[in-house]
């Protein structure tokens, strides 16, 4: 009996699966992926991405919990169910060939910030040294607006809103109201640096808000 063939490099998939498992476990231990929430992906090639399957405890992932989707968000190779939010990953890979990794988490800081700032649609952060953590930035003397999109179960609507903003603004990530944060980068290290920078900056803004009363 012939072994099944797949339209992607299975050895590369195994490498990326382990990379995702190791990094996602650390994020789960930090409390950023409660109750099987969150989803994570890495570009596999110019047509496919490796992504976590839906409904799994992100602190206990195994290789079979990493599946392949095409850039239309459809499962490839195995009949597994991807996250409902897969389109929010694949739209970035399709639009930006340089993006290699997308991370989506649900930390309390991210979720609270998204709720507080949803009415104005963004959170402005400026003057922080850690703004230099974002790729292409070399100074703290700047401001960025972190978008806050309304939550919806219609990923086509949300992905269109994200695309429209990307036409006008350079982004490293965004929040969804009552939901969490998306961050991305050229590889896992880049995406994690952006994710951690957002977490730090959001935490600072929430603390300043409390102190100012």
UniProtKB/Swiss-Prot annotation:
Gene Ontology cellular-component terms listed: cytoplasm
Query: Could you give the cofactor binding note from the entry?
Result: Binds 1 zinc ion per subunit.
Q: Which domain of life is it from?
A: Bacteria
E.C. numbers: 4.2.1.109
Which InterPro entries would you find in this protein's record? Aldolase_II/adducin_N, Aldolase_II/adducin_N_sf, MethylthioRu-1-P_deHdtase_MtnB
Q: Which GO terms describe its biological process?
A: L-methionine salvage from methylthioadenosine; monosaccharide metabolic process
Metabolic or biological pathway: Amino-acid biosynthesis; L-methionine biosynthesis via salvage pathway; L-methionine from S-methyl-5-thio-alpha-D-ribose 1-phosphate: step 2/6
The cofactors it requires, by name, are:
Zn(2+)
The residues that the entry says bind Zn(2+) are 104, 106
The enzyme's main class, written as a single word, is lyase
- Catalysed conversion reaction: 5-(methylsulfanyl)-D-ribulose 1-phosphate = 5-methylsulfanyl-2,3-dioxopentyl phosphate + H2O
Q: Which SMART domains does the entry link to? A: Aldolase_II (SM01007)
Alphabetical keyword list: Amino-acid biosynthesis, Lyase, Metal-binding, Methionine biosynthesis, Zinc
Q: Which GO terms describe its molecular function?
A: methylthioribulose 1-phosphate dehydratase activity; zinc ion binding
- According to its UniProt entry, what is the function of this protein? Catalyzes the dehydration of methylthioribulose-1-phosphate (MTRu-1-P) into 2,3-diketo-5-methylthiopentyl-1-phosphate (DK-MTP-1-P).
> Which family is it part of?
Belongs to the aldolase class II family. MtnB subfamily.
Provide the protein name: Methylthioribulose-1-phosphate dehydratase
Instruction: Supply the gene name.
Output: mtnB
